[in-house]
Design a protein with these regions (language model features):
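N-terminal amphipathic/basic leader segments beginning at the initiator methionine
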Residues: 2-36
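N-terminal glycine-rich anion-binding loops that anchor highly charged ligand groups
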Residues: 41-59
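A conserved active-site cap/scaffold subdomain adjacent to cofactor or substrate pockets
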Residues: 234-334
Length: 553
């Protein structure tokens, strides 16, 4: 697929950094925080990562129940609260994977919000192609195995139904959307750091250069670099590290920090900003006017978060070697990041999938007073004894307050000294048999009267719920990239003076005339006919249809 660019609209990088803010770290993060960051700081882009590993499987279930759902509804909350107006006023580009399992519906919501404030020229790009579930049988027939990362088991050997399957796309489609003038970009599953890398491919002129060279979106993005860029892989690595550092939102501006007592005013924690310079240098800072902090220790903790091998942090765009990264406190709330080394992009892309896993439920009781841990253990033994005939039922027990969060070797050493005043006894159960879960739910509350003394805190019987099991695997790039689509959605405004308006009016009247006799026989249809007829002296009419334009392939 070509990049389909007609002219360059690349911001000048020069000595001024590109400022990219993070609006949050997951679906469920503070919903209005992105608006606060937009108002307090001058950004070029706002990126928001809404998708955790299993979020898409949840969204897929929602979409099956309601074809218009399956996306991160928190996006609508802050857009409607003034976010769409602020994006327009400050000319900030929004790039987010809020589209989840249904990026088209999410994009239409965004367009509706823009239309409400009169932003009719707003261009919303939809990036799709990550959802491979509709093509699963074809992919299996053509050699894709979807072997589980940990067990190595092939999906065909498991036999369970795959409920969702999404490949992690890279930065190329995002850069393409920005090149054709998108104001807001809605994606499905895109690698977290690629949200930022796509912005930089556009702002640094790489995407425009790729168009000039006739490169396709499937070509390695390192090849998009202009001739004067001497170390494109290392630049990509720096951009990727920047995206990795801010994709978890406030986790790099003071949240979830080991030395939490040093962080001022957690109640008003501000979100992080990455400032990126033309030579690849990255500075991490934070929004103005609130609590939080950015220092070397905080950035270091986020740097090693979820990376696996620091010598090979794999993304669709580049493989990053982090071992030579240097972090320096430049000033208060500013950390300079340098030294990332890039290696060529991987041949495969990660797939986040979920398979049908039977049924599950969870419930808990509170045990308080002397020897709370001993009595909680007795409760657990009683429940297991009463359910021992259910051979397929798996029971997992946690004694919260009794050291359950400690590593096993430490818990064994301190278990004899633990004497918590209360313990939250929590069970999670699973089974392929729904009735097993129902039987479990009926045995929890009776322990208040039929177990040790001092047991309470029970609630309603938990209902059996369908269980999804995470299935991470790989897929070849050639099975994904040719199917990625970038579409541009805009509002179509029509007045009486336009030829399009006259065509629509004429076509509608012709249809109505053929149905006139039937419609007149039904009294309830007359107001509708009158409404659709359009009197010739009407004022300018506005039709807010959606016009879709697919990027040239």
């Amino acid at each position: 697929m070509g990049l389909a660019v007609r002219k360059s609209n690349v911001p000048a990088l020069a000595d001024e950094p590109i400022k990219i803010g993070s609006g949050g770290g997951f679906w469920g993060d503070r919903p209005l925080a992105p608006l606060d960051l937009l108002k307090s700081d001058d950004l070029d882009y706002l990126m928001i990562d809404y998708l955790a590993e299993l979020t898409l499987s949840i969204m897929t279930k929602q979409k099956r129940r309601d074809p218009s759902s399956g996306w991160a509804t928190d996006l609508e909350l802050w857009l409607a609260a003034g976010g769409i107006h602020t994006l327009r006023k400050k000319s900030v580009k929004l790039v987010t994977n809020a589209g989840g399992a249904n990026p088209e519906s999410c994009a239409r919501m965004v367009l509706e919000q823009a239309n409400k404030i009169g932003w009719h020229e707003c261009k919303v790009a939809v990036i799709s192609g990550d959802d491979i579930l509709p093509r699963l049988d074809y992919l299996l027939e053509n050699g894709e195995e979807f072997a589980h990362f940990e067990s190595g088991e092939k999906i065909s050997e498991n036999g369970a139904e795959m409920m969702s399957a999404n490949a992690y796309l890279g930065a190329g489609p995002i850069a393409s959307a920005l090149e054709i003038g998108a104001d807001i970009i809605i994606t499905g599953r895109v690698a977290d750091a690629s949200l930022l890398v796509g912005c930089m491919l556009h702002s640094a002129g790489w995407a425009h250069n790729a168009f000039q060279l006739g490169l396709t979106r499937e070509s390695p993005v390192a090849d998009w670099a202009p001739e004067n860029v001497r170390n494109p892989l290392d630049i990509l690595a720096q951009w990727t590290v920047a995206g990795h550092l801010i994709e978890c939102g406030a986790q790099v501006s003071g949240g979830n920090y080991s030395n939490w007592g040093d962080v001022p005013n957690l109640a008003t924690l501000t979100l992080p900003i990455a400032e990126i310079y033309s030579d690849g240098v990255v500075k991490i800072t934070r929004g103005q006017g609130g609590g939080g902090m950015v220092n070397r220790g905080i950035v270091a903790e986020q740097l090693i978060y979820e990376i696996g091998d620091p010598a090979a942090y794999i993304t669709p765009d580049v493989v990053v070697d982090m071992r030579n990264i240097t972090l320096e406190d430049e000033s208060e709330d500013v950390v300079v990041v340098t030294g990332a080394i890039g290696k060529p992009e991987p041949e495969s892309l990660k797939v986040s999938a979920a398979i049908e896993g039977g049924w599950f439920a969870a419930s808990s009781l509170l045990v308080s007073g002397p020897d709370a841990l001993g009595r909680a253990t007795a409760c657990d033994a009683a429940l297991r004894g009463r359910l021992s005939a259910l051979e397929e039922l798996e029971i997992y027990t946690e004694f919260i307050g009794g050291g359950v969060s400690l590593p096993e070797n430490i818990r064994q050493r301190v278990s004899s000294t633990l004497n918590p005043p209360e313990v939250l006894l929590r069970w999670a159960v699973s089974s392929t048999n729904k009735q097993d879960i129902t039987d479990f739910s009926r045995e929890v509350a009776p322990l208040v009267l039929t177990g040790p003394a001092g047991v309470g805190g029970y609630g309603a019987r938990p209902k059996p719920r369908r269980q999804l099991q995470f299935w991470p695997s790989l897929i070849s790039r050639k099975s994904i990239e040719p199917f990625v689509r970038v579409e541009l959605l805009t509002h179509l405004r029509i007045t009486q003076e336009s030829e399009r308006f006259h065509f629509i009016r004429k076509r509608t009247r012709n249809i109505l005339s053929r149905l006139q006799d039937e419609l007149d026989d039904r009294e309830w249809t007359r107001p509708i006919v009158k409404k659709l007829g359009w009197e010739s002296n009407d004022a300018d009419a506005e039709v807010t249809n959606l016009q879709e334009k697919e990027v040239e392939s």
